[in-house]
């Protein structure tokens, strides 16, 4: 499969800059793989497609305020630091991306906060934009994290071209988020409100929560036409025994199994055994799913409308079928569905 097969023209006005007023009131396009039928619904109508014993698998990773702005020592030049992950708690070492990269070198000190209350030293270059920073902070680890996060802001995707607003802290986070570590929100889950979750529970649907810490690799441009040559960034994930039991029981009893988002789909396809059952997994995945691909666990999927040429669109097309999904995207453009993390949703049955 070639990269260019996933190109389409997305007008900028269809990229959602803000979420729907209520989480579960975004639009929902329902795509039926067996008949090719496409329905236009509201997200809360997802209730109509699931019942007793059906399983929803969610990603409970939690986004942290990863984007910091600071100044370089001596010159005072403004810099952006994007926190990726903590490497060493005791030494306050973090893996980060910096911008402008060419001006940030080993040995430089970076200052954050109005009174330069937080200082970091560049101790290593990891990639062209990647650096290892050591934060110089005297308090304990909890105090350090609190101070660091107070300086950070919600890491909205770059395609949301506006300033971060107070509501983003809440809305760019799933209501069931629990395990901190993501710099990208699993967007399919953003449509699930507390009320909708309650109503699914009343219908006796089952919930399973795995963890995959979504990273910036989701937005990295693919620079090869032949998709077999693309390498995904690795992401940390955990599928525990509870998830395995709930999913395999539902599957064995013939119930629907819904993967809520591409991150969930990547995780369960990483943790699947040869007989199509889920198994426990703790580690890293760099699984890249593109057409054609045979899925083993999920029978349905919720996902957002993705950017052209993105790996997320490729996975969606793998599950829904390339022709059907690209046709559905044509319809979405004509019907002015909203794209991106704050946009509308698609349910593939």
Curated annotation (Swiss-Prot):
One GO molecular function term? S-adenosylmethionine:tRNA ribosyltransferase-isomerase activity
Subcellular location as annotated: Cytoplasm
Q: Which GO terms describe its cellular component?
A: cytoplasm
* Keyword flag Magnesium: no
Q: Which domain of life is it from?
A: Bacteria
Main location, first listed in the record? cytoplasm
Mind listing the UniProt keywords for this protein, alphabetically?
Answer: Cytoplasm, Queuosine biosynthesis, S-adenosyl-L-methionine, Transferase
Q: Which SUPFAM superfamilies did the record assign? A: QueA-like (SSF111337)
Q: In which pathway does it act?
A: tRNA modification; tRNA-queuosine biosynthesis
Q: Which is an annotated Pfam family here?
A: Queuosine_synth
Q: Which reaction does it catalyse?
A: 7-aminomethyl-7-carbaguanosine(34) in tRNA + S-adenosyl-L-methionine = epoxyqueuosine(34) in tRNA + adenine + L-methionine + 2 H(+)
**UniProt-listed GO biological process terms:** queuosine biosynthetic process; tRNA wobble guanine modification
Q: Which residues cross the membrane?
A: none
The EC number(s) attached to this protein equal 2.4.99.17
Whether Cytoplasm counts among this entry's keywords is: yes
Q: What is the role of this chain? A: Transfers and isomerizes the ribose moiety from AdoMet to the 7-aminomethyl group of 7-deazaguanine (preQ1-tRNA) to give epoxyqueuosine (oQ-tRNA).
Q: Which NCBIfam families match?
A: PRK00147.1, queA
HAMAP family in the record, alphabetically? Answer: QueA (MF_00113)
Q: Which family does it belong to?
A: Belongs to the QueA family.
Subunit field text? Monomer.
- Protein name, as recorded: S-adenosylmethionine:tRNA ribosyltransferase-isomerase
Provide the species name. Parabacteroides distasonis (strain ATCC 8503 / DSM 20701 / CIP 104284 / JCM 5825 / NCTC 11152)
What gene does the UniProt entry assign to this protein? Answer: queA
